[in-house]
Design a protein with these regions (language model features):
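Hydrophobic alpha-helical segments and their helix-loop junctions in multi-pass secondary transporters
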Residues: 96-99, 103, 135, 151-177, ...
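Alpha-helical transmembrane segments of helical membrane proteins, especially in multi-pass transport
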Residues: 91-94, 228-240, 265-314
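Membrane-water interface regions at transmembrane-helix termini and the short interhelical loops
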Residues: 105-111, 128-149, 207-211, 292
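Transmembrane alpha-helical segments of multi-pass small-molecule transport proteins
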Residues: 13-24, 47-61, 87-95, 114-136, ...
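Helix-loop-helix connectors at the membrane interface of multi-pass transporters/channels
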Residues: 103-121, 207-228, 286-312
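Hydrophobic, membrane-embedded alpha-helices of multi-pass small-molecule transporters
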Residues: 9-29, 45, 49, 53, ...
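Membrane helical hairpin/interfacial module
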Residues: 27-120
Length: 361
């Protein structure tokens, strides 16, 4: 980890890395997905999902601290160079898939709500070029964007939670706990895509100064993200009926239409436009992680791996044309995330700790 020292950042910045990578485009429309199983109780499911993420982050820290490096180092130490590199490559492929999903979802929102005739390829190129410029500046620049994104998130959601009181229906959420625990768990499972982003820790850990003592900032980051998701779901349920939620794809954008200020109209346009910094922050972290991972595995220069991944992302974005295809791709991403980060990583962490303690004896 000594070779990373010049690029390392302060531990508190991990809070902004986690929150900026977790709070993305999914927060604009996840309410419809989580309410399918738990109805208005789905906000409880978000809290459950957040607690599960906190546990997974704890496992990640145990793994990374024992490996004294990133996930690639952990895999190589346990499985050897060839098998370890192959397993690491699967995680890097997930990062690429996740970046494509985030990019295409945001472009779809812009096309539906703002510019219906704008081409997918044009927006893809503009956003990917911005991300390429940021990632080329190094990890500290990527973290700087994440920091700005985190500050922006706090301001944006403060405005977005300025609810029009005449539309609030408190009886919507009553009675609480009206669904079974099984329904709550199914709803929590459906929030996996929205809660994703914390897995970036597997690659950024060596770049955090005093990484072993930085866990509290990661856990607080997850807790803050969970709070934002919970408030987002809760306030959406106060304003919209279950029928409305079922048919509105992006509930928070729909609610933004109800927000009015004396000096500002069409708040949803401001919301969508401002969300670009969130998208760029997430993409920069994902592209940095995947391009650096390829550099470590194949010994290529990172600028070439970054160009390669950006081109792949651009091409796949053009292939996802319909709402069904985009939604199916997001579901596919969520499924991969479930098996890798909620199942494999905790198991691998436990086995790695056992192996480490066995060698110590």
């Amino acid at each position: 980890m000594a070779s990373y020292r010049r690029q390392q950042v302060s531990p508190y910045l991990l809070f902004f890395i986690i929150t900026s990578s977790q709070i993305g485009v999914g927060v604009l429309g996840f309410q419809r997905i989580i309410s399918k199983d738990a109805g208005y109780d789905a906000w409880i499911s978000v809290i459950i999902a957040g607690l599960v993420v906190n546990i997974v982050v704890w496992f990640m820290y145990k793994l990374l601290m024992n490996a004294q490096g990133d996930i690639i180092d952990a895999h190589k130490k346990f499985f050897g160079n060839i098998v370890g590199s192959a397993l690491s490559l699967l995680i890097l492929i997930y990062y690429v898939i996740a970046s494509i999903s985030v990019l295409r979802l945001y472009i779809e929102i812009v096309q539906v709500w703002m510019f219906p005739s704008i081409s997918t390829w044009l927006l893809s190129i503009i956003i990917l070029l911005l991300c390429y410029y940021i990632v080329s500046g190094g990890f500290r620049v990527v973290v700087g964007i994440a920091f700005l994104s985190g500050l922006f998130t706090a301001l944006l959601w403060a405005l977005l939670f300025h609810l029009p009181h005449k539309y609030i229906h408190m009886d919507n959420i009553l009675p609480i706990f009206d669904h079974s625990f099984k329904d709550l768990l199914l709803s929590a499972k459906n929030s996996i895509y929205t809660m994703a982003g914390f897995e970036i820790l597997l690659m950024v850990f060596p770049f955090i100064r005093n990484g072993n003592s930085s866990q509290k900032f990661a856990q607080w980051g997850v807790a803050f993200s969970t709070l934002v998701f919970t408030l987002s779901a809760f306030t959406t349920f106060l304003l919209l009926s279950e029928k409305q939620i079922e048919h509105v794809i992006w509930a928070r954008i729909y609610i933004a239409k109800l927000v009015h200020f004396p000096f500002l109209e069409r708040f949803e346009y401001i919301l969508i436009s401002s969300f670009l910094i969130k998208v760029i922050s997430i993409l920069a972290l994902l592209l940095w992680s995947s391009s650096r991972g390829l550099k470590l595995i194949f010994k290529w220069k990172q600028k070439y791996t970054l160009i390669f991944i950006s081109v792949i992302s651009f091409i796949v974005c053009q292939l996802l044309e319909t709402r069904y295809q985009i939604n199916a791709f997001a579901d596919y991403t969520s499924r991969i995330s479930l098996y890798i980060f909620y199942v494999y990583i905790p198991i691998f962490s436990i086995v790695f700790m056992i192996m480490k303690s066995g060698k110590a004896k």
